[in-house]
Curated annotation (Swiss-Prot):
InterPro entries: Na/ntran_symport, Na/ntran_symport_glycine_GLY1, SNS_sf
Protein known as: Sodium- and chloride-dependent glycine transporter 1
Membrane topology of this protein: Multi-pass membrane protein
Subunit structure: Interacts with EXOC1; interaction increases the transporter capacity of SLC6A9 probably by promoting its insertion into the cell membrane. Interacts with EXOC3 and EXOC4.
């Protein structure tokens, strides 16, 4: 080792977990690491010009260990960390990463991820896709796509975030030129977080409106109803608070004039809740009841995330499990109703001829891709709070299967009630089936009015929607907050993370106000159709290419083996390299070929609105090439090819976040020079230096003399 290399190298001997530091017995056992925090000991003797650095450091270590100075130093170091807030409570003593924190236990992570993946789409989109694409036959391509695309991508994102212990921006130290992928994920999460909370606020509004003896959308005798209203129930027979029976003449009138007549639930939704304007450009007034519910929704999200994953991890014990209780209650009630079996058979009866249609496979792939939350950044973020050796392979399988099983289960709940409604009206199930907001706020609420004690069932249904939405919203907000905090990375923002969460929540509330106007539903559906559509496919495809082919599949497989103790199974290796990217490309092509201009009921969106939608979609995708060009301009290199190589190779700080996990090829050997960006203290003439490596290299304790 040359003299220049010895200027800041330090010794880090092996440590015994149960008995504290163990002094090395030979220079070969000394590992040289960069200086991060320094404690100073009195001058030592024994180092001569002919003595090697390792031998000198070894003598210092033996002297400090045998004299008891080293344990005192380590105790003082721990005390200083505690005083600085690094060890604030007994809970964090269980954390591996004192800087960022970890989940309280593994159940919290699994429940949070289940709540993130299982959202409103499982209830209002999957059942509709299933019956439209061949009923039970749709299950075949659905689970094929789950096995070959869904679970592999889910595992990739979980392992990516867990290995680096960073959010969707920090993980791109793996290949800095592709950091734009992380920014694209942030943009997507921002869009979804804005409009998703508006859907939750509408569910809050319906929940509060259900706290009444008679549901306000049950009859046509309200001030907002028109002459075209024809309900299943006849308000004229409402006497002494009794529930009327549907009159055959009224039903006949409703069915014969279905094109001209509207249901009371539809008029309640369109004329009272939304006060819908006639055009997307006509904002009208802000609906104050919805604005208030939006504030409640954002307040709930903020309070649940006020301490990051420490608080949200406790909330999900309820928010991620109670929806299953409600689903089970609604299922038991639904299957006992007359006509429920017809609805379930309509949902499950296979039409095998549709398996040969490309559209069915495209819908199956798209539903798997979107329902699991891939490329949103949330999976990477949630996994970044795992402990390093957590078995994320097992978690990815459990969570993915739970998500898909929930979708199938929700289909039974939805179609049992819709079958009852169709039987009551004497029409085919297809006449009452719907998806999206039309199912959640029109069709299903109307079906609930036919049940005894209908307000109770309505309360349960909308409470379930609220919890399903909040589970996803927690992760969307945490994705943005974690990305900001990790990117800044200093001690101040770590201590002020609550204020960052508050700032993001307030910004989300303000940006959501236009969606509570009379034209709000038009903008909500525009964002839903464009902001998180093909852009997710592009982001996910580039992520696969960057990890598997730029960073290298062998490197990534070795990383996973170091983290989990075993390499990814051969099936996942093949899927990551070939199958999943091919499926993603198929989804992208299918999305382009099957593109149709957006409509809402019979309203056709104008060209300028569609253009805004495409701009929203492109805004997340363009982050990738724009940041790549920026990175190339900032990277050293004599030629473009050299710059490209330097910009795509992993940065110096890529790898496990904690030094105790940086083994093998990640184990540092020689301290970098000051020009590498590390601060190296000069050797002091009158005292020897034994640097004690801390958990945060950006801050340094003061001179400590013993």
């Amino acid at each position: 080792m040359s003299g220049g290399d010895t200027r800041a190298a330090i010794a880090r001997p092996r440590m015994a977990a149960a008995h504290g530091p163990v002094a090395p017995s030979s220079p070969e056992q000394v590992t040289l690491l960069p200086v991060q925090r320094s404690f100073f000991l009195p001058p030592f003797s024994g180092a001569t010009p002919s003595t090697s650095l390792a031998e000198s450091v070894l003598k210092v270590w033996h002297g400090a260990y045998n004299s008891g100075l080293l344990p005192q130093l380590m105790a003082q170091h721990s005390l200083a960390m505690a005083q600085n807030g690094a060890v604030p409570s007994e809970a964090t003593k269980r954390d591996q990463n004192l800087k960022r924190g970890n989940w309280g236990n593994q159940i919290e992570f699994v429940l949070t991820s289940v709540g993130y993946a299982v959202g409103l789409g499982n209830v209002w989109r999957f059942p509709y896709l299933c019956y439209r694409n061949g009923g039970g036959a749709f299950m075949f391509p659905y689970f094929i796509m789950l096995i070959f695309c869904g679970i592999p991508l889910f595992f990739m994102e979980l392992s990516f975030g867990q290995f680096a212990s960073q959010g969707c921006l920090g993980v791109w130290r793996i290949s800095p030129m592709f950091k734009g992928v992380g920014y694209g994920m942030m943009v997507v999460s921002t869009y979804i977080g804005i409009y998703y909370n508006v859907v939750i606020c509408i569910a809050f509004y319906y929940f509060f409106s259900s706290m009444t003896h008679v549901l306000p959308w049950a009859y046509c005798n309200n001030p907002w109803n028109t002459h075209d209203c024809a309900g299943v129930l006849d308000a004229s027979n409402l006497t002494n608070g009794s529930r009327p029976a549907a009159l055959p003449s009224n039903l006949s009138h409703l069915l014969n004039h279905s094109l001209q007549r509207t249901s009371p639930s539809e008029e309640y939704w369109r004329l009272y809740v939304l006060k819908l304007s006639d055009d997307i450009g006509n904002f009208g007034e802000v609906r104050l009841p919805l604005l208030g519910c939006l504030g409640v929704s954002w307040l709930v999200v903020f309070l649940c995330l006020i301490r990051g994953v420490k608080s949200s991890g406790k909330v999900v014990y309820f928010t991620a499990t109670f929806p299953y209780v409600v689903l089970t209650i609604l299922f038991v009630r639904g299957v006992t109703l007359e006509g429920a079996f017809d609805g379930i058979m309509y949902y499950l009866t296979p039409q095998w001829d549709k398996i040969l249609e490309a559209k069915v496979w495209g819908d199956a792939a798209s539903q798997i891709f979107y329902s699991l939350g891939c490329a949103w950044g949330g999976l990477i973020t949630m996994a970044s709070y795992n402990k390093f050796h957590n078995n994320c392979y097992r978690d990815s399988v459990i969570i993915s299967i739970t998500n898909c099983a929930t979708s199938v289960y929700a289909g039974f709940v939805i179609f049992s009630i819709l079958g009852f409604m169709a039987n009551h009206l004497g029409v085919d199930v297809s006449r009452v089936a719907d998806h999206g907001p039309g199912l959640a706020f029109v069709a299903y609420p109307e079906a609930l009015t036919l049940l005894p004690i209908s307000p109770l069932w309505s309360l349960l249904f909308f409470f379930m929607l609220i919890l399903l939405g909040l589970g996803t919203q927690f992760c969307l907000l945490e994705t943005l907050v974690t990305a900001i905090v990790d990117e800044v990375g200093n001690e101040w923002i770590l201590q002020k993370k609550t204020y960052v969460t508050l700032g993001v929540a307030v910004a989300g509330f303000l940006l959501g106000i236009p969606l509570t106007s009379q034209a709000g539903i038009y903008w909500l559906l525009l964002m839903d159709n464009y902001a998180a559509s093909f852009s997710l496919v592009v982001i996910s495809c580039i992520m696969c290419v960057a990890i598997m082919y730029i960073y290298g599949h062998r490197n990534y497989f070795q990383d996973i083996q170091m983290m989990l103790g075993f390499p990814p199974p051969l099936f996942f290796q093949i899927c990551w390299r070939f199958v999943s990217p091919a499926i993603i490309f198929f989804i992208l092509v299918f999305t382009v070929i099957q593109y149709q201009p957006i409509t809402y009921n019979h309203y056709q969106y104008p060209g300028w609105a569609v253009a805004i939608g495409f701009l929203m979609a492109l805004s997340s995708v363009l982050c990738i090439p724009l940041y790549a060009m920026f990175r190339l301009c900032r990277t050293d290199g004599d030629t473009l090819l050299q710059r490209l190589k330097n910009a795509t190779k992993p940065s110096r700080d890529w790898g496990p976040a904690l030094l105790e996990h940086r083994t093998g090829r990640y184990a540092p050997t020689i301290a970098p020079s000051p020009e590498d960006g590390f601060e190296v203290q000069p050797l002091h003439p009158d005292k020897a230096q034994i640097p004690i490596v801390g958990s945060n290299g950006s801050s340094r304790l003061q001179d400590s003399r013993i």
